[in-house]
Amino acid sequence: MTYNITSKIMPNAKLPLEYVKNTFDKRNKIAKQKSIEFYKNITNECKDGVYSISRIRKCIDNLFAPNKINYTINSEEREQFSGSIANILSIDKEKQILQYDGIALFLPLKKNKTEVENKYTLFHEVRHMIDYLYNPKVKMHRINNLINNEGYSNATDYINKFFMEEISSKTNMKEFRKEASDLIDILPRDIAIETLQKIRSHLITEINAYSDEIRYRFKDIKNIDDFIDALNLKLSYKLNFKFEDKLKFANKKLNALLKEERASLKKQFD
């Protein structure tokens, strides 16, 4: 089934235009500054080590003030210490409008459901939230097109997950690039371009979030266990996820497809 969905970002799910009209590099720089600001504020707010939802909400609200962002904080039930972020979406099927109503943060909560169990997962997911708010049009454009191309959703979802998963010790980047290229080549060129653009955005925000989490872990080292945890995450990020290498490949593949698309369009009008 195919749709012709248009998207609409609701007022409380975005920042005003003056906050996001800069170039990508400038927006990314501001997002990094906001992440540092949140880290400093929440660390100061939670000097007793209790990262309660009420304190987290206070710091997030202050971070984006005077703008009011609609978001929820939920318990992540998948596995200990894991976290995730999702869109709060609603669809008006009659008008065929996809509404982006806000952001849902999923964090590892303690049994009392009022405190975060791992503050570094919090830092990681809040960086995702910041990145999404400073790149709202990119985010909605990707969602919009993927819904309109529902017939390929299983394939595009699989490819996206393939890029985000750890690379097995038995698999090197050369093998990854070949398998990824084979998967992308199955798609029609326009869908492949859209998928790679989504993957590129996803990889960039993962690089940002992991870089922040690693930096804050090393900054907070108080004993040998803290050092080992920070080092293990850094090694896993560099050796297993290889997000920077994947981003280079995605950009190269995307550029090649865009070149083919431009040549095809030129040929049509010659």
Model-found features: residue ranges?
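Pan-zinc metallopeptidase signature
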Residues: 177-201, 206-270
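Non-Sec secretion/translocation targeting segments of pathogen effectors
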Residues: 1-14, 18, 209, 267-270
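Sec/Tat-exported extracytoplasmic proteins
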Residues: 130, 134, 217-220
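Zn2+-dependent metallopeptidase catalytic core
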Residues: 27, 34, 43-68
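Acidic-residue sensor for enzyme active/binding pockets
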Residues: 117, 125, 150, 206, ...
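Short, charged/polar micro-motifs that form catalytic or ligand-binding hotspots
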Residues: 112-116, 120-121, 195, 199, ...
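Post-HEXXH active-site segment of zinc metalloproteases
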Residues: 116, 132-186, 194
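Active-site scaffold of zinc-dependent metalloenzymes
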Residues: 76-119, 126-133
